[in-house]
Amino acid sequence: LVVALGEHVYLRLQDKAPIGLGHCVIEPIEHVPSHVEAAEEVATEARNFQKCLVRMFAARGAQLVFLEQHLRLGSAGLPSRDTMAIECIPLPARDAAAAPGYFKKAILECDEEWSQHKKIYDTGGCVRGTVPAGFSYFAVSFALQAGYAHVVENEAEW
C-alpha cells in the first residue's frame, strides 16, 4: 500500500513481515542500487520523507530507526538486495534510548575478527559519504541524529 508519492521516491507500508505498527519503507520510483549511490535529488527527497516521518512519530511519542541493507547484485551467488529500500521502524520512546547500544553491539559481533574494513563506522545519521559506492553494507540511523554503518565483506555469511 503506497502511502505517499514524491517525484523520485515513495513511501509504502511494509507488507512482508512488518516488525510493528507503522513499519514502512522508502523506495525510489526508478531503480537505484542504494542510498549511497542515489543521485542527489533522490537522496534529498528520501531524507525529506525521513524528516517528516521523524516529526510525525515524535508527535505520537515514538522514535524512528531507519535501516538499509545493500548487498551487491549476484555476490556470492546470493539473491540480490540491489535496490534501495530504507526500512522505517517506530519504537516507543522508552525503548529507543537503548537501540543504539544494541545495534552497535550486534554490528561489532557480526563479522570476522580480521576484516579489511573497520567493523563499524559512525555515520552521524546519514550513510552517504561514509560508505563508498559499490560496497555491500548495512546501515542504521536513529531519528537521523546518529547512526552506524558496517561494510559487509562476506555476503554469504551475512
Go through each PLM region and give its residues.
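HIT superfamily nucleotide-processing domains
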Residues: L1-W158
